[in-house]
């Protein structure tokens, strides 16, 4: 069974993984994959009622900021 506690652990693992691949400047494809994994898991947690609207939005927009800030830095050298 998926409990809120187990879901939080899984979300944290995915968030840390996304942060790591972005911070360590892995390939753009790998960063995009990690971002997609994390944001997809956020949406699943929201759909299952584990996250409320506000918490989903907060985490999603933070992930979006991290990913797109890194992508902009990568493009601008």
Q: What is the role of each PLM region?
A:
Residues 1-77:
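Acidic, Ser/Pro/Thr-rich low-complexity regulatory regions
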């Amino acid at each position: 069974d998926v409990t809120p506690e187990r879901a939080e652990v899984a979300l944290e693992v995915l968030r840390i993984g996304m942060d790591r691949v972005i911070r360590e400047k892995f390939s753009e494809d790998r960063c995009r994959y990690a971002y997609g994994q994390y944001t997809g898991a956020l949406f699943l947690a929201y759909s299952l009622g584990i996250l409320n609207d506000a918490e989903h939005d907060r985490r999603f927009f933070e992930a979006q900021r991290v990913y797109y800030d890194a992508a902009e830095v990568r493009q601008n050298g």
